[in-house]
Amino acid sequence: MASSFSGVLQLTDLDDFIGPSQECIKPIKVEKKAGRAAAKIQIEDDGSYVQINPEGAARKLEKAKITLNDCLACSGCVTSAETILITQQSHEELYKILKQNKTENPLEHKVVVVSVSPQSWASLAARFNLIMQDTAQKLTAFFKQLGVHHVFDTNFSRNFSLLESQREFIQRFKRQKEDKKSLPMLASACPGWICYAEKTHGSFILPYISSTKSPQQVMGSLVKSHFAKEKNLKPNQIYHVTVMPCYDKKLEASRPDFYNQEYETREVDCVITTGEVLRMLEQEGLSLSDVDPSPLDTLFGSAVQEEPVGHQGGGSGGYLEHVFRHAAQELFGVHVDTVVYKPLKNKDFQEVTLEQDGNVVLHFALAYGFRNIQNLVQKLKRGRCPYHYVEVMACPSGCLNGGGQIKAEGEGSKDLLQRVEDLYNTVRTERPEEREEVAQLYGDWLEDKDSAKARQALHTQYHAVEKINSGLTIKW
């Protein structure tokens, strides 16, 4: 049976793709003990392993297991979490919870919440030849037919990510003379990039990375904190699923930083990709086109959302544009009507500048794909990086081309990507500063923009992964 997760062979069209390391995925430091050999290993008839100590006592050995946390703490691979068997992060796990809700004691039921990314809406819309609004409403109805209680749009949580990125950049810009690592500020929404940074460049690169949570994890905070309180639920009474264009989002959700120790629950319990949603539809024998529509839910009482609402600035979230416009106005009193991009070597590396009196006062860039990311890091290491802010994404062409998106059938990959981009751009856009509900939540939920509660809910931290030298990593 074919694996439900994508593999390296499925990504060969990404010419700068960095595959998993061929060394041991989980190198283990072996501590030598003094004395003679302590035990022998015996293989039983059932294939199990038994340790026999010098006194003749036997102890059955357990099989080694690799968890998502092991992946995060391991320096054996650079990225591509999709090549690892992720048992607790799949659509089968969602089915398991939905089945338990139908068969177990009602007191043990979970309120199931699904939060869908706009990139996933666009990929599904392209596959079924639907407009974005119909796709969102039909997918909402599909999930609710399965037993999901609430379906949200992560465009809402992205408002917080954009606003916090704007505020953080202003703070960093103002302290750049005192803090040499305050700029350039590097975007933090892409978990593939974060994983690469922590494992490969560690303590050198981490101070430059924005502390703002991604929209997925902000949505996790909203659902397990604000929404839970509104519904008189404990965080562990909610099972929160996100639908994402990227397999690395599964790793992001599994970071210890996003685990609530008090209630023993994660902000996001399960991440499924757009491709896995397609498999769910196929498993149910349904075409999304044939599902009757249902409005999206909102985080505000009984209100419903008739259509997805997006943001300007491209299919990866629009971080560069929003931070650039805000910084131009806040720092230099300049209102930017149109952000003009200047492509450099390719469309995945572009620059944006603001000039005053013939001088460049703001110098921004976007860097998509690992080839461009590596070039960016080398500029930083040589002290030749001219940028104040960089929108960094691991996938060439950004999130709309994520590894978890639906693959092309009967058309070229570039043609499909163009259709997905066109559909994504049909959605009505909004400025996060103008969203009344966002301003309301800053007061009611977070108490204040600068509160400790806001810091905990909307920001995170990163961890350099120490390289482990072990005999198990030797190449023969």
Swiss-Prot record:
Origin: domain of life: Eukaryota
Keyword presence, Cell inner membrane: no
A GO CC annotation given for this chain: cytosolic [4Fe-4S] assembly targeting complex
Gene Ontology molecular-function annotations: 4 iron, 4 sulfur cluster binding; metal ion binding
Residue numbers binding [4Fe-4S] cluster 2: C190, C246, C395, C399
Keyword line: 4Fe-4S, Iron, Iron-sulfur, Metal-binding
Family: Belongs to the NARF family.
Assembly and binders: Component of the CIA complex.
Listed PANTHER family: NITRATE, FORMATE, IRON DEHYDROGENASE (PTHR11615)
Protein name listed in UniProt: Cytosolic Fe-S cluster assembly factor narfl
Species assigned in the record: Xenopus tropicalis
Gene: narfl
